[in-house]
Swiss-Prot record:
The organism's place on the tree of life at top rank: Eukaryota
Protein's pathway: Mycotoxin biosynthesis
GO biological process: secondary metabolic process
E.C. no: 1.-.-.-
Transmembrane segments: 13-36
Listed name of the protein: Cytochrome P450 monooxygenase ATR4
One GO term describing the cellular component: membrane
CDD domains on file: CYP503A1-like (cd11041)
Role of this protein: Cytochrome P450 monooxygenase; part of the core atranone cluster (CAC) which products are predicted to catalyze most or all steps of mycotoxin atranone synthesis, starting from geranylgeranyl pyrophosphate (GGPP). The initial cyclization of GGPP to dolabellane is probably performed by the terpene cyclase ATR13. The Baeyer-Villiger oxidation near the end of the atranone synthesis, which converts atranones D and E to atranones F and G is predicted to be catalyzed by the monooxygenase ATR8. Of the CAC's other predicted gene products, the reducing PKS ATR6 might synthesize a polyketide chain.
Species this protein is from: Stachybotrys chlorohalonatus (strain IBT 40285)
Glycosylation site positions: N291, N444, N454
Family: Belongs to the cytochrome P450 family.
Keyword terms of this UniProt record: Glycoprotein, Heme, Iron, Membrane, Metal-binding, Monooxygenase, Oxidoreductase, Transmembrane, Transmembrane helix
One Gene Ontology term of the molecular function aspect: heme binding
Length: 524
């Protein structure tokens, strides 16, 4: 080519291209494809006519709005709720479009079956199951079935088992400081105890005491989130290339391999007990093995189910219990109220599990239950705790069309704190439910308890797909809180105050470095 016939700029470009290696050409090409993919985005379904909300200006590119939803979802949703709470609106993300629906639609969708609107698939899709080995949990409802069919009907039995494991865990894992105030990183302490309890109920011994299992059960959530975060840096069409190269994913696989060996031993114990005619249903793994399909029965699938259970239960329960303690330290006048109630229940009914089964004993703690319900109301584990994936096209009574494949959510936290609904809802009122239970002529005594679902308490979801393990979680939290209040005093370190809840996307988080001052007061 006669370069002298071209202009100087064109000459430089051609000379530069001639000098490039294949790597030098591939990297800019890949970057261009990445930018185009993110700029254009996949056409995720949206409710017809619903406006896209969150742009800072009419000139802001969509990929910038989508990027802001990772750390700015709370602010975008808050402003959208204020302006558009009575109509559907859309918050776009790189991985989906979230269709925010008005609260008025809750009653209409609450009983829709999961083959039409599915909440389970929304939860697990946030962990990119295809690339975090969680696909068996996405394809199966075995975990939900064991909670609804085994755990809940036998809740009293499993709460009693929890009491025994909690006794053991407190003796071995909780520090003793005599009567001197000591600053303690207490969140890892309660996380470990909760992990032991979960493993005892679901896997049994010896797995619940296996240090490798405790580490993996605690860490699998963070590991899967790390893989997901790494993958979200790339367009979805590149994930099959990127995923095998991620160090975070290789680390997760190594942990899964270790977990499989632990679960395999528990499966062997189950099989040997069957051969010996010693069928034992103390663990939920036993029920799962007896009621699973051939596809669900593999060691890897059962291990994934156990990891998914840990993901769905340990960190959420820890988050809720930590928030209760933080609320109490922010309002220390409520410590003596709860301790007086505990002392009275012990005076009348003895220690937990001695004269009454643990579940019935915990039901006597009405003031504690009310305080817990209030903290759960104001500090849900998900900003949009009610979500669905539309597996079929749905038309609502007012003509609103929900397209197949659309992801739906409700601004549940904003609704339960909306001053236009009730001017008192934004304030922490620990006896709110206690007063409601004791209003009237006794007809409300079994209502307004922690874990029950209504339009004022949406932290566990809503309708027929609300969290199936919520009643066990509530009993677990109350039991641990009772033990902590009987044995320890708490306060914030000098100069510290209540840590704020913050959100990464829709997921609620606490400062993991937040500590408390603790000291022994008495021994159970």
């Amino acid at each position: 080519m006669r370069l002298d016939l071209l202009g100087p700029v064109a000459t430089r470009i051609i000379t530069y291209l001639d000098s490039l290696t294949w790597v030098g050409m591939a990297l800019p090409l890949f970057s261009l494809c990445w930018a185009i993919s993110y700029a254009r985005g996949k056409a995720y379904p949206t409710v017809p006519g619903a406006p896209v909300y969150g742009y800072n200006s009419r000139f802001e590119p969509s990929f910038m709005l989508k990027s802001r939803t990772y750390t700015g979802f709370y602010d975008i949703l808050s402003n959208g709720y204020k302006m558009l709470k009575d109509v559907p609106f859309v918050i776009p993300r790189h991985d989906t479009n979230i269709n925010i629906l008005p609260i008025k639609y809750l009653d209409e969708i609450r009983l829709m079956p999961k083959h039409i609107l599915n909440s389970h698939l929304v939860l697990i899709s946030q962990m990119t199951p295809k690339w975090t080995w969680l696909q068996p949990a996405a394809d199966s409802d075995l975990v939900t079935r064991v909670l609804l069919t085994k755990l809940n009907p036998d809740l009293q039995k499993y709460v009693d088992i929890t009491r025994l494991e909690l006794d053991s865990a407190f003796k071995s894992d909780f520090p003793r400081h005599d009567e001197e105030w000591t600053e303690v990183d207490f969140q890892p302490l309660i996380r470990r105890v909760l992990t032991r309890i979960s493993a005892k109920i679901f896997l049994g011994e010896p797995a619940c005491l296996n240090e490798d299992w405790l580490r993996i059960a605690i860490g699998y959530t963070a590991g899967a989130l790390e893989v997901t975060k790494d993958l979200h840096k790339f367009p979805s069409w590149t994930h099959f290339l990127v995923a095998p190269l991620l160090p975070s994913r290789r680390r997760l696989r190594r942990e899964l391999d270790i977990a499989m060996k632990i679960v395999e031993k528990q499966i062997q114990l189950h099989e040997q007990a069957e051969k010996d005619g010693l069928k034992n249903y103390d663990t939920l793994l036993d029920w799962m093995l007896d009621n699973c399909s051939d596809k669900e029965s593999s060691v890897e699938a059962m291990t994934i189910f156990q990891c998914f259970i840990a993901m769905a239960s340990i960190h959420t329960t820890e988050f809720s219990l930590a928030n209760v303690l933080f609320d109490l330290c922010a309002h220390p006048e409520w410590f003596p109220v709860l301790r007086e109630e505990l002392d009275e229940v012990i005076r009348v009914h003895g220690n937990i599990g001695h004269r009454l089964p643990a579940k019935q004993w915990l039901q006597k703690l009405e003031k504690m239950d009310s305080l817990l319900a209030e903290t759960l109301r104001l500090c849900p584990t998900m900003l949009t705790s009610i979500q669905r994936l539309a597996l079929e096209k749905v038309q609502l009574k007012d003509g609103t069309v929900i397209p197949k494949g659309s992801r739906l959510a409700w601004a549940s936290l904003h609704h339960v704190t909306d001053p236009e609904v009730d001017g008192t809802l934004a304030a922490w009122d620990p006896m709110r439910n206690y007063r409601k239970r004791h209003s009237g002529s006794g007809e409300n005594l079994t209502k307004f308890v922690a874990g029950q679902i209504n339009e004022s308490t949406l932290g566990f979801g809503y309708g027929n797909q609300a969290c199936p393990g919520r009643y066990f979680a509530v009993n677990e939290i109350k039991m641990m809180l009772a033990r902590l209040l009987l044995e320890f005093e708490f306060k914030f370190p000098e100069g510290k105050s209540r840590p704020k809840v913050f959100f990464i996307g829709e997921i609620a988080c606490l400062d993991h470095d937040a500590t408390l001052m603790m000291r022994n007061v008495r021994t159970c």
